[in-house]
């Protein structure tokens, strides 16, 4: 069963899904070893590893590289925070294909305009 299928099954069968946040492959592995159901590859945490605010400063490639390394390291599903989708419809389509091909189980796209303002500031 693929990690995406595991995530879908868990979402349908569990009343609560335990998802732990990570910012790189090592922290994702710690989340997995702690018994969480999935890893949240959050843009806030990934931005923080570069000493940057979560404000659309990093590129899709930088976020993708972090999430992809988590996926290749862990056996549990990765849920990737993809901010506002990194552009228009063509960008979103490209992003979805890359993340899917890398084995990322799910993505989250915020309904905000680019450049995004961190949700904690609103």
Question: Which positions does each model-derived feature cover?
Answer:
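N-terminal amphipathic alpha-helix/helix-capping segment at the start of soluble metabolic enzymes
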Residues: 1-21, 25, 29-34
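Alpha-helix-loop-beta-strand connector modules within alpha/beta enzyme cores
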Residues: 3-9, 13, 52-80, 102, ...
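Structural preference for beta-strand elements that scaffold enzyme active sites
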Residues: 17-19, 38, 77-79, 106-108
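Glycine-rich anion/phosphate-binding loops
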Residues: 20-25, 57-64, 84-102
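Glycine-rich, proline-tolerant flexible connector loops at the mouths of alpha/beta enzymes
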Residues: 39-62, 84-88, 107-122
